[in-house]
Design a protein with these regions (language model features):
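Double-stranded beta-helix
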Residues: 1, 8, 13-14, 74-111
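A short glycine-rich, His/Asp/Glu-containing loop-to-beta-strand
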Residues: 1-30, 37
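Short acidic-glycine-tyrosine-enriched beta hairpin
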Residues: 53-70
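Histidine-centered divalent metal-coordination motifs
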Residues: 32-34, 73-75
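Short, conserved beta-strand element in jelly-roll/cupin
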Residues: 20-24, 33-49, 88-91
Length: 111
């Protein structure tokens, strides 16, 4: 997984963070949540996104997905395709903007 920051807060009161994130085939994040939510805009390849307890969603370039505040989820590339997305979120103080949890198992990833 490669992360390239695009935008971050520069002035008092600004909270938006934007990054380009690239995934090799089969690569994915760990389970995590965001205090103020997260928006993902797919730019290349095939993305897999899943909220805990929900069905895995497949997304393609041009599609935008939203993960609500506090929703545990993971995202990554499909098993046979590179994937790139823009990740956008507002930073938060308490709790932190991103709370990282356990790794996504191969069984969870492939289900």
């Amino acid at each position: 997984v490669w992360l390239d920051p695009i935008a971050s807060p520069r002035e008092v009161g600004q909270r938006m963070v934007v990054a380009k994130v690239r995934f090799a085939p089969g690569a994915r994040t760990a389970w995590h949540s965001h205090a103020l939510g997260q928006t993902l805009h797919i730019t290349q390849g095939v993305a897999w996104v899943q909220s805990r307890g929900g069905a895995k969603v497949e997304a393609y370039p041009g599609q935008t997905l939203y993960c609500p505040p506090g929703e545990e989820h993971w995202h990554g590339a499909s098993a046979d395709s590179f994937m790139e997305h823009l990740a956008m979120l507002d930073t938060a103080d308490h709790p932190p903007a991103t709370t990282w949890l356990e790794h996504v198992t191969d069984e969870e990833y492939l289900s």
